[in-house]
Amino acid sequence: MSPLLPQKKPPPPPQDAAISLAWEAAHRRRAAICAWVAAALTIIGSILSALGTSSVPTFPNDVVTAPDAINNLLAGQPIPPGRTAMQVEWFQSHLSAANYVGTVMSGLAALVLFGVIAFLFKATRARNPGFGQATLIAGAFGAVAFGVGTTVAQMTSFIGIAGFDGGNNFQATEALTAGPVVIGQILLTLGSFGLGFAFVLLGLNAMRTGLLTRFMGILAMIVGATFIIPQVDPQGVLRSFWLAVIGFVFILRWPGNRIPPAWISGKSEPWPSIAASRAAKAGASDARSTPAPSLPEPESTGSGDTAGQLRKKRKRKK
């Protein structure tokens, strides 16, 4: 290799297992509480924020097209309210305090979520020092941006709806897309990508080090995808389920004590690949099906007597 080319540094050695386990023991309960609180806030917040407003009528007979609006203007007539304005008025009549409370809870859920990300990142990096800091940075930025963006976008949208005093579609759209709403939506989008990136990398690397089972690791990556494509899990059910389960994993409590061994040893203990698992199962099955070796048959003579019977006859003759 040319001396002019930069030498690739070897990865640092894993952190001492005793140090890792001591740190995890001191912080695992706090991380588990963060997971359970985030799960509860996510599911309850999504229900409350949509309470009474999830089935907005379509008002198909109140659609105002562009030609209709132009004709009304040319004739000196006011533009009729239109479907968007009718929907905003309907939403206004169904808006309640529960919607505001649910929005705040959803925003807080994202902030609390960072406690889960930080703990799992620290535990994973202790067993795999090559795991980059970018995941933690993306998780921190994503949690703040997602939480603030959710709260700002929905709260200002609710305020705009509550202050709507009638009008046409244009005025209704202005009420729904005021300046703070747009800023909140931008933050929400950026935060979604940050959390999605963090969850996918955390799920993959925690699974590789043996901290997460294959099911939990793959589910973490799916949860990351739902941040970017919220239509897959609009109520956050998958996210809440994963958070509730990971809380029990953090405190090493699970039925049958089926906790991943890496949490106990403090070292990386990767899960075997699917091919290796199948080979191990096949080997165990072959071992069970192999018959035990049979004992050799006693030697016989032409007269039909066994060797033992012949020895007895010789003794009698003597």
List each model region and its residues:
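Hydrophobic, aromatic-enriched alpha-helical segments typical of multi-pass transmembrane helices
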Residues: 2-318
